[in-house]
């Protein structure tokens, strides 16, 4: 078959496919006039824009990964409640009070925490967050409606609440804003791929995966390129300079995790480690003098992988927590 | 000295009463002492010991006036990380269902044109 003839056959097949699609459309619409530009019409856009936001009731213990409006109404005294919020890695979360009906004098409260805190362990850790712990709480009973919106510093936040009186409660709206250079992230999924970039910022950034995972680092850049020559940082590890560390642990706080590997120099190519801890973290320490970047993939370990100890893994420490 | 110790005992009793909630099911809040030696980034100003406490404000209102009580309490949730995963999986499932509903609505709009 000559190349020209092959090309003609492909062209005919494309036309047949297009005709088939149009035919199906005509069958559905009967005598309707086909106009592909309708997909971009202003009416359609307005119709879609007028969609109602996602709404649902909030439970005493809940997790929200979608923006929308959420209402909690107590049907009995609810004394120990919390809702976790998580967005995409490149999103900030904004919590807006729409309506609050609680009795602050009677012991009710509504407190937003900038991050997650579980069993006293925080993400981001105190070392990685710009504010001290106490200032990461925003108490509705102290600020009232003078501060109706609270924005998180990363893709996670949470709210603690207590409501004694049945019928009382609150309504909040959750929105997300883009975060161009995500610093501290908790992954929504047990598998994925991410690039952590810290451009000339003196800060420590952590990517947390609350699953046992295999992490494969494909690219680590510490310093910026001058032409083709990579400028290396003066010091890479030992707690100074620019470096990446892999951590594993049973809680949320990276500063309380076990260091499993330090990556002190830039490299290309896959470097994989299995971390069978409840929580695995890729943490970048940056001096602020360079553009640092690490790209990695992660996937949840299968049960049989947790049982066997092979390859580049540290099972003794982590398996004890399972 | 006697007054000081009496005050300490009083605070301990209050703390014990607050933390003890008979019959409360999981989850529960943890009221944890804030470690004043906790490491913070050098660029952040260290919080003074006179900072206000968090937690149930009515229960801790008297601690502001106490010159002897330097323990601050933070609010935390006492649930295992496994439960957090379950909640996360439920949230992803609901998000997927919501996305499917949104897609169906979009397709319905397109189909009517």
Curated annotation (Swiss-Prot), chain A:
Any one annotated GO CC term: varicosity
Gene Ontology biological process terms from the UniProt entry:
behavioral response to ethanol; cellular response to calcium ion; cellular response to cAMP; cellular response to cocaine; cellular response to estradiol stimulus; cellular response to estrogen stimulus; cellular response to gonadotropin-releasing hormone; cellular response to immobilization stress
Q: Which residues form the signal peptide?
A: 1-24
Carbohydrate-modified residues:
204
Q: Does the keyword Signal apply?
A: yes
Q: Keywords in UniProt for this one?
A: Disulfide bond, Glycoprotein, Secreted, Signal
Q: Which Pfam families match?
A: CRF-BP_C, CRF-BP_N
Subcellular location as annotated: Secreted
- GO molecular-function terms, A-Z: corticotropin-releasing hormone binding; peptide binding
S-S bridge residues: 60-81, 104-141, 183-205, 237-264, 277-318
Q: Which family does it belong to?
A: Belongs to the CRF-binding protein family.
Task: Write out the function statement from the record.
Answer: Binds CRF and inactivates it. May prevent inappropriate pituitary-adrenal stimulation in pregnancy.
> PANTHER family from the xrefs?
CORTICOTROPIN-RELEASING FACTOR-BINDING PROTEIN
Q: Spell out the protein name for this chain.
A: Corticotropin-releasing factor-binding protein
Curated annotation (Swiss-Prot), chain B:
**Modified-residue entries (Valine amide), positions:** 110
> Where are the coiled-coil regions?
none
- GO MF annotation terms: corticotropin-releasing hormone receptor 2 binding; corticotropin-releasing hormone receptor binding; G protein-coupled receptor binding; hormone activity; hormone binding
What Pfam families has UniProt attached to this entry? CRF (PF00473)
Is Acetylation a UniProt keyword of this protein?
A: no
The record's GO CC annotations read: extracellular space
Sorted alphabetically, the Gene Ontology BP terms of this entry are: adenylate cyclase-activating G protein-coupled receptor signaling pathway; digestion; hormone-mediated signaling pathway
Q: Does the keyword Signal apply?
A: yes
UniProt lists compositionally biased (Low complexity) regions at 37-61
Task: Give the residue ranges for region: Disordered.
Answer: 37-64
Signal peptide as annotated in the record: 1-23
In its record, the post-translational modification comment is: Glycosylated.
- Show the InterPro entries listed in the entry: CRF, Urocortin_II/III
The protein's location, in the record's own words, is: Secreted
Name the propeptide positions.
24-71
Q: Which key words tag this protein in UniProt?
A: Amidation, Glycoprotein, Hormone, Secreted, Signal
Complexes and interactors:
Binds with high affinity to CRF receptors 2-alpha and 2-beta.
Per the similarity annotation, which family is this? Answer: Belongs to the sauvagine/corticotropin-releasing factor/urotensin I family.
Annotated function? Suppresses food intake, delays gastric emptying and decreases heat-induced edema. Might represent an endogenous ligand for maintaining homeostasis after stress.
Record-given protein name: Urocortin-2
């Amino acid at each position: 078959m000559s190349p020209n003839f092959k090309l003609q056959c492909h062209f005919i097949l494309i036309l047949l496919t297009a005709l088939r699609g149009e035919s199906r459309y005509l069958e559905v619409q009967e005598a309707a006039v086909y106009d592909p530009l309708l997909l971009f019409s202003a009416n359609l856009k307005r119709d879609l824009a007028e969609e109602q936001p996602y709404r649902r009731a909030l439970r005493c213990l809940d997790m929200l990964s979608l923006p929308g409006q959420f209402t909690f109404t107590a049907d009995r005294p609810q004394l120990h409640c919390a809702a976790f919020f998580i967005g995409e890695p490149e999103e900030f979360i904004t919590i807006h009070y729409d309506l609050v009906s609680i009795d602050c004098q009677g012991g009710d409260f509504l407190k937003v925490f900038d991050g997650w805190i579980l069993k006293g362990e925080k993400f981001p850790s105190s070392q990685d967050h710009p504010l001290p712990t106490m200032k990461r709480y925003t108490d509705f009973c102290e600020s009232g409606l003078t501060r109706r919106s609270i924005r998180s510093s990363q893709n996670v936040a949470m709210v603690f609440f207590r409501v004694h009186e049945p019928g009382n409660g609150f309504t909040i709206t959750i929105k997300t804003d883009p975060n161009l250079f995500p610093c501290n992230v908790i992954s929504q999924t047990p598998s994925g791929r991410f690039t952590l970039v810290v451009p000339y910022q003196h800060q420590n950034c952590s990517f947390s995966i609350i699953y046992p995972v295999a992490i494969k680092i494909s690219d680590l850049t510490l310093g910026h390129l001058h032409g083709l020559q990579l400028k290396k940082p003066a010091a890479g590890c030992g707690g100074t300079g620019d470096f990446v560390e892999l951590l594993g642990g049973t809680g949320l706080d990276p500063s309380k995790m076990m260091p499993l590997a330090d990556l002190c120099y830039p490299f290309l190519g896959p470097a994989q480690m299995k971390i069978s801890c409840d929580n695995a973290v890729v943490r970048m320490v940056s001096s602020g003098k360079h553009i640092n970047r690490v790209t990695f993939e992660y996937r949840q370990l299968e049960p049989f992988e947790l049982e066997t100890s092979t390859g580049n893994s540290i099972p003794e420490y982590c398996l004890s927590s399972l | 000295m006697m007054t000081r110790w009496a005050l300490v005992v009083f605070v301990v009793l209050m703390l014990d009463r607050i933390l003890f909630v008979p019959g409360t099911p999981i989850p529960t809040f943890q009221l944890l002492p804030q470690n004043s030696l906790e490491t913070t980034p050098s660029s952040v100003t260290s919080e003074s010991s006179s900072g206000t406490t968090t937690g149930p404000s009515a229960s801790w209102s008297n601690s502001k006036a106490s010159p002897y009580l330097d323990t601050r309490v933070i609010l935390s949730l006492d649930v295992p990380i496994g439960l957090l995963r379950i909640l996360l999986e439920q949230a992803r499932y609901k998000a997927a269902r919501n996305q499917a509903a949104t897609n169906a609505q979009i397709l319905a709009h397109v189909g009517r044109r």
